[in-house]
Amino acid sequence: ALYLPPAGGYRLGDLLTVMARLRRGCPWDRRQTHHSLRPYLIEEAYEVLEAIDAENPDMLCDELGDLLLQVVFHAQIAKENGQFDMEDVIHGVSSKMVHRHRHVFGEEEAETPEDVMRIWEEIKKEEKGQETQTKVLKGVPGNLPALMRSYKVQEKASQVGFDWDRPEDAFKKVEEEVQELKKACESGSKAEIEEELGDLLFAVVNVSRFYKVQPELALTATINKFIKRFEYVETQSAQQGKKLEDMTLE
């Protein structure tokens, strides 16, 4: 039967109907599972970030729609498996937000963003019961990008006092790890180089955390800056009739 869009535009309920029909009528959509959709979920999340960085509202609206589609897709698969549906997802997250914002929906007081985060963490501990701090660290999702995961692990460790006293101490650790990496490189051992490089990156993340700079975003900005510089050099080489290999990035 011919599908006719609703008068006055689509709403969330219409998207659920569209997805249910896609699962019945499209061979590709029908074949998908939670696992097969993982790359698309990650890709769409990063495209949302790109739209935010571009400060383009139309692009952001479009990319948020693509990300929402992934959420609806997973909810539909779960519904078909008799596990949960989109209403359960909405109910769960709404209940969580109300419960964890007692300063808005209850009588708790929070004057600063730091107060809010303290209350948030306290409520999370109440919900999960008494946990060892190691279990808390292991609770940071392993699928996060490594820089982001490092930041969150260090942040949680610092909440129980496992941290440097001053930013200067974190800087000294970076300098120490640089020297150890140099020695590893001199040894020629790939295993040692990999280990020391990991230690150095972890130490650099610690510095970024002290200054509340997200290392993942900082590195992304640097990558974009490098690409712009490369584009400039390539343009200059073409204008000067030179080979790109003869140019430098300086």
Q: Model-found features: residue ranges?
A:
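Flexible "arm" and connector segments at domain edges
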Residues: 1-2, 6-63, 69-197, 201-250
